[in-house]
Design a protein with these regions (language model features):
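N-terminal G-site helix/loop of the GST-like fold
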Residues: 1-6, 162-163
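Anionic-ligand binding patches
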Residues: 17-163
Length: 163
């Protein structure tokens, strides 16, 4: 099956929510709606991911210092990764949120500095790529690994099959 990846022009700054899970679902729905409007009749999947550290939402870091701050907060701690997925065919829209709990080993300041000096953390929620160098910090996961990567594949496929 052919597919096209498109960036959404949805303004994420307009969205507020009571919980991180509500936030990612609203963001996924907004992105999906924006792309659906540009591609009538297409089946569109919109996604968004945030990291939740004790109620503080970490999106993508805006600077090196922001990445360092996030990584220090994640060091040795349990956090949750929430990914919202929305699918629409233009007439029907469905969405869900998948949540995964992640625990990192303690991360040394030297490791944080080395990692923040790479390109890897800057386009990832929570400033880390679980499939990259950050895999070295992983103590345990409760939930779907692919939720951490930004698309809970098995749940997404199950929903997509209904369209």
């Amino acid at each position: 099956t052919d597919f096209t990846v498109c960036a959404s022009d949805f303004d994420e700054s307009t969205v507020t929510a009571d919980t991180p899970a509500e936030l990612v679902e609203m963001l996924a729905r907004g992105k999906c709606r924006a792309v659906s409007a540009q591609h009538p009749g297409a089946v569109v999947i919109g996604c968004d991911t945030v990291v939740d550290v004790k109620g503080e939402v970490f999106g993508k870091p805006h600077s090196v210092e922001d990445a360092r701050r996030m990584l220090r907060a994640l060091s040795g701690a349990v956090h949750e990764v929430h990914t919202g997925v929305c699918i629409s065919d233009g007439t029907r829209t469905e969405s869900f949120v998948d949540t995964c709990r992640v625990k990192f080993f303690p991360i040394s300041e030297a490791e944080i500095e080395r990692y923040a000096a790479t390109e890897e953390p800057y386009d990832k929620a929570g400033a880390y790529a679980i499939q990259g160098r950050a895999a070295l910090w992983l103590d345990r996961i409760e939930g779907d690994y692919y939720t951490i990567m930004g698309l809970p594949v098995s749940r997404t496929i199950r929903l997509l099959e209904r369209f």
